[in-house]
Amino acid sequence: MSTLELHHIGKSYQSVMVLDRIDLHVPPGSRTAIVGPSGSGKTTLLRIIAGFETPDAGKVILQGKAMFDGTTYVPAHKRGIGFVPQDGALFPHFTVAGNIGYGLKGSQRDKERRINELMDMVALDRRLSALWPHEISGGQQQRVALARALAQRPVLMLLDEPFSALDTALRASTRKAVAELLSEANIASILVTHDQTEALSFADQVAVMRAGKLAHVGPPQELYLRPVDEPTATFLGETLMLTAQLGTGLAHCALGQVKVDNPHRRGEARIMLRPEQITLTPLRPEQYNAASCLAKVIAIDFAGFISTLTLQIISSGETIEIKTISREDLHVGLTVGLDIMGQAHIFAE
């Protein structure tokens, strides 16, 4: 049985459809990331799951029980769902301990014991318990918000872009710590984000949302390497898209012959490669004949660790852009050999 099931969820505001027949299953103890651009409907979907809003159609099932099905509506505070908002939303007039313990029942001793357990769980120094929210760092504030959400022993944790306000280094470390914590506690979770890297690294199930629909749902590696369509491919990362003629397990394209992930397709198709699949080797003139594909570097856009190279394929004159790790031996006018690792992905007809 799934922890959460969404069946044909629909939602409109006046004449604007925000969610269009959303179906999603969240397995027990799993981490799901819903990723999409601003305005795609992901936050509205999260609010419907939490019980802050009701859908116009569909069913929300939590651990086999209907939270909403058109006749049944269970309010947010009775769903057993934890919620961590984007800014943490800590109570400024409560200490760290007061925030974590908000809503806990029992004796003062029991509350203190539970607060200490939760602080240990989210790796917060107990000495912070008497401090006010403004006296601790952004990363610590997010851990307090998570501890407060965990205090009620939720069956599902919802995370609404909780790392977006943190700096890059802190965002990555906090994200990893939260993912490990939720896994250890065996709590299913849903992260909403517009950051593709965050979604791919946090989740074991990624759902790409576009214009109120889930375009593709599956494991992160599947979505990255075998996306359902070109918009999903480009949204999840840098790509090289090429038109090719297919036959006998190979694509004949501007880069020469490339292995493909569907050897049975024939005819013309669009194929995709990720930048890390393409290896560039600077060549001397006497090495040209041994290269499977020759290209000339006609422009370099340096951006620190990564550079964008504009290459002109010598055999066809076609130009392509690829991103690669910046190297001192690459310069405009250089002739390079291109080699492809792995298979190109063929998009469905």
UniProtKB/Swiss-Prot annotation:
Give the ABC transporter domain ranges: 4-236
Q: What one GO molecular function would you report for this record?
A: ATP binding
EC no.? 7.2.2.7
Compartment(s) of residence: Cell inner membrane
What the entry lists under Pfam families is as follows: ABC_tran
Q: What is its main location?
A: membrane
Gene Ontology biological-process entries:
transmembrane transport
Q: Which SUPFAM superfamilies match?
A: MOP-like, P-loop containing nucleoside triphosphate hydrolases
Q: How does it sit in the membrane?
A: Peripheral membrane protein
* Reaction equation(s) it catalyzes: Fe(3+)(out) + ATP + H2O = Fe(3+)(in) + ADP + phosphate + H(+)
Cross-referenced CDD domains: ABC_Carb_Solutes_like
The positions annotated for binding ATP are G36, P37, S38, G39, S40, G41, K42, T43
Write out the similarity annotation: Belongs to the ABC transporter superfamily. Fe(3+) ion importer (TC 3.A.1.10) family.
Say what the protein does: Part of the ABC transporter complex FbpABC involved in Fe(3+) ions import. Responsible for energy coupling to the transport system.
Record-given protein name:
Fe(3+) ions import ATP-binding protein FbpC
Organism listed in the record: Yersinia pestis
Gene coding for it: fbpC
